[in-house]
Structures are given as structure tokens and as C-alpha cells.
Amino acid sequence: MNAANRIALPEQPRILVIALRRLGDVLMATPLIHSLRQAWPKATIDALVFADTAGILEGNPDLNGIVAMPPRPTAGQGLALAARLWRQYDLAISTQCGDRPTFFALVAGRSSLAPVESTFSGRLKRALLDRSVAYAGGVHRVEEMLQLADALGIARAPRLVCPHPRAVEGVSGDYAVIHAAPMFRYKQWSKEGWRALAAWLAGRGLAVIATGGPGEAERRYLDAVCNGLSVVRRLDGRLDWPQLAGLLAKARVYVGPDTSVTHVAAAAGCPTVALYGPTDPRLWGPWPTGGLDTMWDAAGTMQRRGNVWLVQNPLPCLPCQLEGCERRLESYSACLDELSPRQVIAAVEEALG
């Protein structure tokens, strides 16, 4: 933090944080929002997000409001929102380099901040913005958010903030949570692996709860995983984000792939076993409750940071940062398909203590 560089704002400023990407990106913007709340306790802080990601901010104590926009707005909807936001905030911050979030930061804020790339369009944005951060890539997404706090001259508060937890009726005792069905095929572990893990967890005397999204493909995959497995209680498609946070906070252990639920589990303090394939954990690894003093390595059989165990099948191509071996969302990923149940169970056993 460079206090001499602190931006001058009113004592009770209005601040807008813009995060127009997927659920995980929105969650990873919460350390920036938390830093803003610590710096300006009396501020009004809102977030501009896509409507289908707003739930992950529900009950966030650092936010006063959420401005939700359609994931694919028409030109008319975009212009109407811009007119509605025009100069409504003392400070507007884009968490992305893209044209649309930067445009809304310029429109909404009397002062504006955004990351910019070293391109012609980036140089143009830098000239229009009041403050900017050079986007270089190659660092953890949370670190990118904290660099925006640095640019404002305020102290970092590197904590992911979960949705406000709410209890799930009828769930008690010792239980494990598995999240077998990510939204995209290329992040899936094998059905056989999940079945072996569920049976092992039940053998340890734990109730096994399966979570998942409402999508048809996710439901079908979980159908195949759970077929004939009476030990698994399914709550897929039935929980909102606060309920998920409440469920995860009291779980003995959570196991899941690179998905937003895994990031919530880590932030909630649950012993979390994350199964990573193509995704680079140096950029997108789970953020433990105590933060990351030592960043994740690119690849390894098992790494531990705080309450998170990160498991990989370290093939020579890992991490490729591609959408599976076929470079498409519905592709298989050999690194995950060939990840052995024995390796995952060893990490879960350690996480259970």
C-alpha cells in the first residue's frame, strides 16, 4: 500500500465494482470489495454483475446493493443501463480489461479505475481512465484484484467473502460433500472415481451429500455417478448460494473440481480437496481462508495450502489452460479421466485428519 497515492474520495463515497464474467470471477472480486469496505466503512458499495452470477454475492456484508444486467444484453439494454448509471458513483472500478466493463466504469464513475493491456485499445483506455493498472497476466486472479486496491492507495484485505450462510433443513451430523458434475465436461473427473470415493466416504461413517447445478447435462452425469449408490443423498439443483455456503461450512470434507462451488468451500473454511485438470492453479487455484502465503505450483501430485488440498495428475502437458484435449467445453481431459481414486482418497484421508 502506498498511502501517499490514496485516492481522494468523500467520507461516505459511492463506489461501483464491475465484474462481468463467470461466477468464479465474481467471487474472486470479493477481496477487492472487502478492501474497499475496510478503507471506507461508511461507503455505499454496489456491484455490477450479470444476473446469473448475482446469487454468489447474496448477503455479502461488504455490499449495499447489486446491479444485475442480462448476460447477453441488447444494444438498447446496454445503453439504458449506461444512462441509469451515468455519474452515479464517486468511483467505479472495472475488474477486467474488456471494453464493456471499462465502458461502464467510465460512464458510472466520476473517477474510474481498470486494468489495461499493452495494446492500442489499452493505451486509449489508459488515457480515458483516472487510474489504471497494467495487466500482465500470469498471477492469481485474487492478486489481480488486490493490485487494484494498491492502485487506490488502500490496504489489502485478501479474504474471499462467501454468500451469507443459511442452514439446509434436514442436514446434520457428520457428512461429506461431493460436487461431481461441473458445468463443463472438460473439468469432470471419472464416474468410476466418484463412485469409489463415495463408497470409501460411507465406509468411514460419513453421510455423503452430492451437490450440483440445475443444468440437464449436470443432472444426467450425476445420475450416472449415483446409479445404484444408495449411500449418496442428492441435493443438486435444490440449493441457492447461501444454502450451499451453510452446507459447506459444516461439512467434514468437500471434494470437487475447478468450479465456483469449490472456491466457496475453500473460503467457507471447509477442508477442501480440489481436483484440477487443465486449469492453472497459479492463476485459479482455490483461495484458503487464511490466504496464500505461498502460491500454488503449476503441477504436482498433491499440494496443500491451509484448508485446501489440490490434487492433479501431473502429465507433461499440465496445466495446458485449454478446454480439454479437444479444445472445446464438452471435451474430455485425459489428466482428469486418468486421475486414480487412490490418489484422491489419500488427499481426502489427510483432509479428514
Show which residues each predicted segment covers.
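Catalytic machinery of carbohydrate-active enzymes
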Residues: 1-353
